[in-house]
Amino acid sequence: MNIMRKLGYLFLGLFMTILPSCAAMTFPNINIGLQNANTPQDFTNGLQILIWLTILTLAPSILILTTCFVRLVVVLALTRQALGAGTLPPNQVITGLALILTFFIMAPTFNEINEKALQPYMKNQITQQVAIDRGIQPIRNFMFKQTHEKELALFVRMAKIEKPKTKEDVPTYVLLPSFIMSELKTAFTIGFVVYLPFLVIDIVVSSVLVSMGMMFLPPTMIALPFKLIMFVMVDGWYLIVKSLVESFVK
């Protein structure tokens, strides 16, 4: 009991010693609220902050829709479905592999953006608008290489703009949906080629089971081992990844 009382006195003494120094401390005043813009510059700065916050919020979608991610993840998902292995590989593995391959394929484009736009802007050598113009150009060049003329002509016509004479005349808001449509078309074309051998195995296994009178035995359960052994023997992941990466090199 005496020990507890002594400890209480000790803490009380320390508190009384620290209290004067705490009273002398000054704390910053933080105000969060809406204030009227007194000058056009204040309004412009606030609008720029709002735009940048919106861009940061949409950054994952921008990364997905302006790079090769769409084609990669669709083909990998169709490959998993063709194998008939259920959720193997899991979605995290499919998405992670597609994301890693995206950074690998887009590395030259990202390096060009870093050298021509980001680094000069960080060193205050160019203005913000110049950095944006330089940064978007490598992305536009990449999208143009993968965009089909049919899809581009469709959105140019739907946008009701004058027929572009050069690539620079094509607005980004027209190029972006054209690129996405082209990527989906290419992805499903590759997916069909990948799906076909596994479909043949399913048909053969089903025919054999019907001829043997085993109509109530699920064909997918029998076909799965044959699909897996064929996929491993031909080094399927190597061929698919190799074909996907090379499809962006033109």
Give the residues covered by each predicted segment.
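N-terminal secretory/membrane targeting signals
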Residues: M1-A24
